[in-house]
Amino acid sequence: MVTIRADEISNIIRERIEQYNREVKIVNTGTVLQVGDGIARIHGLDEVMAGELVEFEEGTIGIALNLESNNVGVVLMGDGLLIQEGSSVKATGRIAQIPVSEAYLGRVVNALAKPIDGRGEISASEFRLIESAAPGIISRRSVYEPLQTGLIAIDSMIPIGRGQRELIIGDRQTGKTAVATDTILNQQGQNVICVYVAIGQKASSVAQVVTTLQERGAMEYTIVVAETADSPATLQYLAPYTGASLAEYFMYRERHTLIIYDDLSKQAQAYRQMSLLLRRPPGREAYPGDVFYLHSRLLERAAKLSSSLGEGSMTALPIVETQSGDVSAYIPTNVISITDGQIFLSADLFNSGIRPAINVGISVSRVGSAAQIKAMKQVAGKLKLELAQFAELEAFAQFASDLDKATQNQLARGQRLRELLKQSQSAPLTVEEQIMTIYTGTNGYLDSLEVGQVRKFLVELRTYLKTNKPQFQEIISSTKTFTEEAEALLKEAIQEQMKRFILQEQA
């Protein structure tokens, strides 16, 4: 018979008591009532915060958007096909955030900042909230440095400054993405970090943009955030905020950044889909009441920081697609009212061969000449005036049969000026080349040429000036002014090249 030793038992009990951990872990959980169409309704989760991440039993992550009296409306960041009614959900206690670091440069990521280019993981030790507050009034300073796009029509007449928000608006297939990608290409060597956010686009279109950037060496300073048309609405809605967080990381490190949202119409549609499925009351065009806030809180994050914060900047170029040129629709009017100006691309101009198809008459920059170097101001003023007069005369000339000589000359000059604004895609020009081009046109040097010869002459003149008069470029880049010396060099080059060009054409 085994004897029971009381002291042994008491020792074991004491040891167990000493090892007992009284830590109580409270987990905020709930149960799935209903799931479908990228939305789940959860019973429970009493302590959940608005915008908090929740985790489902099978691993899917969602965001709590609707906090109602008897249930929580959650949008899913995935297809949610494995989520079952009655399965458990737990709150994570975290708001959506992404890792950020220099290692993101040159990579293609999704809305959760996970790489999708097949080049392995991205190392990052820091995190930023996807939705962070925009800089306040004291944290900002007025925009004063130019951000060159490389497009004559924009840099001369609708200038963009670092820290500005300039809307690119137009119908489908009018070259909106081309304007944005040309701007990225033109930042080479300018120490500007670019972020391109593709929302709800075809995967082939995004691949084409990435290929263009890689071929031109622009991916070295660019991050692409892509959520294609087959992505869940939640991720299409989040993608612009992810892009903004990546750009902010560099902005607060005293760097200059450029972010392109292509396009915000698709983000608004994704948000409308989510809101209607969550049974939020629809407003104008079935968009929810807070669709203005959706875009304003995103675009207000673009800023030029004050001297005390290091003068970093984030320039935003949001793109909005119109239907049949209707800029008075809900989303276009909202974004126009938030931004500091808009570049309007016209389908009629595009189809008539004027590319980039910028309608200079109704495009505007509310920063204006503050975002131009002095040399550009000196030559650009005359260009805008002459083009405006030409547009007026051209409309009038359609009805008038006989025009006086002065009017005919002005129409001829206008046609040549319109010709010099045309540029091939992915061929941005330096400021010096733009100044030379505008000066040549506004001072009548192109009047003696046929309209069809203008572009050929200008291409040859740029090459001639670069090889034979390099001082011209040096003067403008060092002084930022169109000095008398620079003007004399340019006049000389134009006259010499004109003689050569006429001889070539006659031969």
Curated annotation (Swiss-Prot):
Gene Ontology CC: chloroplast thylakoid membrane; proton-transporting ATP synthase complex
CDD domains documented for this protein: ATP-synt_F1_alpha_C, ATP-synt_F1_alpha_N, F1-ATPase_alpha_CD
Pfam families: ATP-synt_ab (PF00006), ATP-synt_ab_C (PF00306), ATP-synt_ab_N (PF02874)
InterPro entries: ATP_synth_asu-like_sf, ATP_synth_asu_C, ATP_synth_asu_C_sf, ATP_synth_F1_a_nt-bd_dom, ATP_synth_F1_asu, ATPase_a/bsu_AS, ATPase_F1/V1/A1_a/bsu_N, ATPase_F1/V1/A1_a/bsu_N_sf
Membrane disposition: Peripheral membrane protein
SUPFAM superfamilies in the record: C-terminal domain of alpha and beta subunits of F1 ATP synthase, N-terminal domain of alpha and beta subunits of F1 ATP synthase, P-loop containing nucleoside triphosphate hydrolases
UniProt site positions, description: Required for activity: 363
Chief location: plastid
Subcellular location: Plastid, Chloroplast thylakoid membrane
UniProt keyword terms in alphabetical order: ATP synthesis, ATP-binding, CF(1), Chloroplast, Hydrogen ion transport, Ion transport, Membrane, Nucleotide-binding, Plastid, Thylakoid, Translocase, Transport
Enzyme class label: translocase
Enzyme Commission code(s) on record: 7.1.2.2
Cited function: Produces ATP from ADP in the presence of a proton gradient across the membrane. The alpha chain is a regulatory subunit.
Subunit structure: F-type ATPases have 2 components, CF(1) - the catalytic core - and CF(0) - the membrane proton channel. CF(1) has five subunits: alpha(3), beta(3), gamma(1), delta(1), epsilon(1). CF(0) has four main subunits: a, b, b' and c.
Family statement drawn from the similarity comment of this UniProt entry: Belongs to the ATPase alpha/beta chains family.
Protein name: ATP synthase subunit alpha, chloroplastic
Species in which this protein is naturally found: Atropa belladonna
